[in-house]
Amino acid sequence: MFRNLYAEEARHNQTNITMGKMLKMDPVTYSRKKKNGSFTVTEAKKLTEFFGVSFEYLFETEVET
């Protein structure tokens, strides 16, 4: 769902396991949230701070034309 989130994880060599630990959640929960876009505001803020990018960039979605 969030291609830039996937890209930043790859650039920083992060896995669902390490990201889940950082957000204090199970890796499976993190993976589900990544797929369905259900991050809380607090979780989204932690992710943007961790990767050092803007919310708009990290959570940009593809727009179909």
Model regions and ranges:
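Residue-level signal for the short linker/turn that defines the boundary of a DNA-recognition helix
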Residues: 13-14, 39-42
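Residues in the helix-turn-helix
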Residues: 18, 28-29, 57
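DNA major-groove recognition helix of helix-turn-helix
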Residues: 34, 43, 62
